[in-house]
């Protein structure tokens, strides 16, 4: 079963319009794919229907821009085809936990309460919600890590946009952005080839774990999106004179709260690229820390540099039947900023499912790592 607090499936990839799939390939003159499985199916299916655009980036890697509406339907179809029951619009209100095991979940929906019992659980909430509600130890950043509200632009000149130079936009944001109520000086504006829409990721705001602040994140993100449109119309009228927002995404959260695992992945470990004995996923994305309003902090690695996520940073040290996947695994702030992107999240999801399957009714801390890595060989060793 999959449980989602949103009224539909897709997480931030759909609801927050992340808009790009990154982290599937290495960086370098000949980048190669390091995460496979469901990623291969997604690329093949969405490419065939024209909903995915392959991009060779200026940083020497391969990323994909996707149509979020078509991705949402693809996810729904895949869930149905796999026979997975989905419970949407379900907010976690309580966790039955004893003897180092989650026994059941208590959920609230607009149609009434629900209770879910399972042998094992994956915390893919992004905010370590399952572990937090179970009373397990969690971590939070010492300083803000900024989120973004992505949005889709339409009405711009699709011929003139070919002349858009993003560095000129960045320079103008640094010079005049404050006059339009803007705080961020970088980000991207990405026209979808063959379509009449553009993805915008150029906002920054704080994302506190405060229930009363949720609406303010939406308001502030949309206010910045509106101000970006004003800025583009005034500063780049040849392209954006008639531009407008077509769709606002939900606030995109990056690093808010994460588990305390059996071990913590560190920046030094991803710099070294040393493969741990319990490697469960392979990564190559650079450090991308949104710790300042104005600019993202990047730390770039050498071409073809890869590093690994150990299973021990995905398993809460106080629980036997939970594996975390995604941006709530245990890593220091810098390391987490590198592994939280979509490619590694897919790899962690696969590792979590296989680890819990091997654990059966026992402890995920005690599984046969050779058996797990044999199942995950495409994501750990394949070079293609």
Which residue ranges define each predicted feature?
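Conserved beta-strand positions in the Rossmann-like core of class I SAM-dependent methyltransferases
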Residues: 1
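Short, well-ordered alpha-helical packing segments
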Residues: 76, 92-93, 103-106, 119, ...
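Short low-complexity, flexible loop/linker segments enriched in glycine and/or proline
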Residues: 16-19, 101-103, 154-156
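Short beta-strand element of the conserved SAM-dependent methyltransferase core
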Residues: 95, 107, 151-155
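Conserved N-terminal/central alpha/beta ligand/cofactor-binding core
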Residues: 4-94
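Flavin (FAD/FMN)-binding glycine-rich loop and adjacent Rossmann-like elements that form
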Residues: 12, 89, 113-120, 125-384
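Conserved beta-strand-loop-beta-strand element in the redox core of flavoprotein oxidoreductases
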Residues: 96-115
């Amino acid at each position: 079963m999959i449980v989602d607090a949103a009224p539909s499936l897709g997480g931030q990839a759909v609801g927050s319009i992340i808009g790009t799939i990154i982290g599937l390939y290495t960086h370098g003159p000949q980048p190669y794919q390091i995460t496979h499985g469901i990623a291969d199916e997604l690329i093949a299916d969405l490419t065939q229907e024209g909903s995915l655009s392959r991009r060779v980036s200026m940083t020497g890697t391969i990323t994909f821009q996707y149509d979020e509406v078509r991705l949402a339907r693809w996810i729904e179809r895949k869930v149905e085809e796999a026979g997975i029951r989905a419970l949407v619009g379900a907010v976690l209100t309580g966790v039955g936990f004893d003897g180092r095991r989650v026994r059941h979940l208590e959920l609230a929906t607009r149609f009434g309460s629900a209770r879910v019992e399972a042998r094992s659980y994956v915390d893919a909430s992004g905010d370590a919600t399952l572990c937090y509600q179970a009373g397990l130890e969690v971590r939070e950043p010492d300083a803000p890590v900024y989120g973004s509200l992505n949005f889709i632009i339409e009405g711009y000149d699709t011929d003139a946009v070919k002349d858009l130079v993003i560095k000129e936009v960045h320079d103008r944001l640094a010079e005049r952005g404050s006059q339009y109520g803007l705080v961020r000086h970088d980000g991207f504006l990405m026209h979808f080839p063959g379509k009449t829409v553009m993805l915008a990721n150029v906002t920054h705001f704080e994302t506190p774990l405060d229930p009363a602040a949720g609406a303010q994140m939406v308001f502030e993100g949309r206010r910045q999106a509106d101000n970006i449109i004003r800025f583009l119309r005034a500063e780049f009228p040849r392209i954006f004179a008639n531009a407008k927002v077509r769709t606002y995404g939900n606030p995109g959260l990056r690093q808010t709260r994460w588990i305390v695992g059996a071990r913590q992945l560190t920046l030094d470990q991803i710099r070294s690229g040393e493969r741990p004995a319990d490697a469960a996923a392979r990564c190559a994305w650079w450090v991308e820390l949104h710790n300042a309003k104005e600019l993202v902090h990047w730390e770039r690695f050498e071409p073809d540099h890869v590093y690994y996520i150990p299973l021990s940073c995905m398993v809460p040290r106080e629980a036997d039947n939970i594996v975390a996947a995604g941006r709530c695994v245990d890593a220091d702030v810098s390391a987490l900023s590198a592994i939280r992107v979509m490619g590694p999240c897919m790899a962690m999801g696969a590792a979590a499912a296989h680890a819990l399957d091997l654990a059966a009714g026992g402890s995920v801390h005690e599984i046969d790592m050779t058996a797990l890595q044999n199942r995950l060989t495409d994501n750990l060793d394949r070079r293609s």
